[in-house]
Amino acid sequence: MARLNESTASSEPIEILKRRFVRQNREIARVNSIQSLRIRSLESEVSNLLSENVSLREQIITLTQELERFEAARTLHDGVYDVKARLDSKLVELGNLITELGSLPRRYSRAVRENGEPAPARQSRESGPKEVDDTDPEPNLGFLDGRLPVIMEDKLYPRRTLTAQEVQELRDSDTDGPNCSGFEDSSISPKQRVEYDEAATGGPAYFIDTNTIVEEIENEHSLPPNLETRRKKKIGPATVNKDQADTRPISLLDSKFTRKCGAKRKFSAEDDESLFESSPSEDDEFQFSRPAQSPKLFSQNEHASADDGSGELRRPIQSPTLSSQNDHSPVKMKPQSERSIAHVHGERRVLEPKSTNTNILSPAKPSIMKDYNQNHDFGYNEKSEKPLPRQGKGAVDGSKNASPKKSSTRTPVFGNDGNKSGNKQKKSGAIKSNTPSLDGIEDSEIATTADMPSTRPSRRRGTVSQPESHKTEGISMPP
């Protein structure tokens, strides 16, 4: 241990050691440089190998693609070669047919020289369809096998047109049409029809120009020349009478209903009754009649005449519409008017339809209203609203003689009628309302219309005289 710690004295000098270390370092540096060079060369080799690998892979890909193309082309080439082989065989067969076609004239000429008749014509004649009889209504369709029959060029197919005899018959008779051989008798066969035509014309059936036929019969019957005509039925006397009977009422209606060019089509009851009259109606022993006036107005007038006490019968006051309606009733009509309107009005049968176009306010009746207002002037002035003078003493006394019980059972008192016996006041109240009464109620309750003056009359109740007030006290007013 002590020897290890002891410093040994170097036998060689220090310079020799330095040289030795320097030499060793140089050798180490040389070895390092050589190894680095070798590493660089190896790296370059690796890069070269990688590039070669990439190029080789590219070549492999291209080669595989070429191989696939070659394989596809090989299959295509195989198919082409197969088609080519079959085409060659077909060409050989076609060549054989061409050579056979070239040898056909020689064989045909040889056959003609041997037999003296063309063989194809004989074969076609033997195998061709038989002649079809056109007279047979049902040809042998099974033999034709769905084909149309053969049209022979040398056979005559006649057209069934008018013969000379039929044209002559058409000229002679106006009612008979041209005789048609095709439609005369469906049971006759075509052969019998041809024989019948020959017997009728005295020889074989011949045909004339259709243009001349059309020119001859154009005025009488406009028939096309290429169509057959059917014999017309003779018109019997029964049908002629029926046609005349049908046309007669039409002419009557036309003569009755001739109107102006601009007239409105407003139908009234007279038009409907004339329509019903045109048809012949049987007399069923039923007389239709309307009441002469409304029941309420009739009771009023009867009551007024009873209260009057005088022997003379007064004419009942009627509205214009009621008078116009009553003119149509057979009860109200005068003999002259019945004679003048005899062709319009007829007896309406039971349950026969009646016109509903009978509006009493129809604008078609202004002339009736005008005539009524002109002919019935009751002394009323439109500008003055005063009523007519009250009745005299004799009229009041005559009204007292009437029984109050009978007057109370008639009709109730309304409006301005202060007394049942005031007949003149009733008349004046009825004249004040120039408008027609619609429902047949008392004339004193009818409202004023445009025909009245512009200033409305007062609704104040008129004065009642002393005897009239005594008379009304004895009468019991209805509830």
Curated annotation (Swiss-Prot):
Keyword list, A-Z: Cell cycle, Cell division, Centromere, Chromosome, Chromosome partition, Coiled coil, Nucleus
Write down the InterPro entries for this protein, in alphabetical order: Shugoshin_N (IPR011516)
Q: Where are the transmembrane segments?
A: none
Q: Where in the cell is it found?
A: Nucleus; Chromosome, Centromere
Q: Where is the composition biased (Polar residues)?
A: 290-303, 318-328, 400-411
Q: Name one GO biological process term.
A: chromosome segregation
**Which stretches of sequence are listed as region Disordered?**
109-145, 220-247, 263-479
Composition-biased stretches (Basic and acidic residues): 123-132, 335-352, 379-388
**Where do the coiled-coil regions begin and end?**
36-76
For bias kind Acidic residues, which ranges apply?
A: 270-286
Asked whether the UniProt record includes Nucleotide-binding among its keywords, one would answer: no
The domain of life is Eukaryota
Q: What is its main location?
A: nucleus
Ribonucleoprotein listed as a keyword:
no
User: What GO cellular component term, any one, is given?
Assistant: chromosome, centromeric region
In UniProt terms, what function does this protein have? Plays a central role in chromosome cohesion during cell division by preventing premature dissociation of cohesin complex from centromeres after prophase, when most of cohesin complex dissociates from chromosomes arms.
- What's this protein's family per the entry? Belongs to the shugoshin family.
Give the protein's recorded name.
Shugoshin
Organism annotation:
Emericella nidulans (strain FGSC A4 / ATCC 38163 / CBS 112.46 / NRRL 194 / M139) (Aspergillus nidulans)
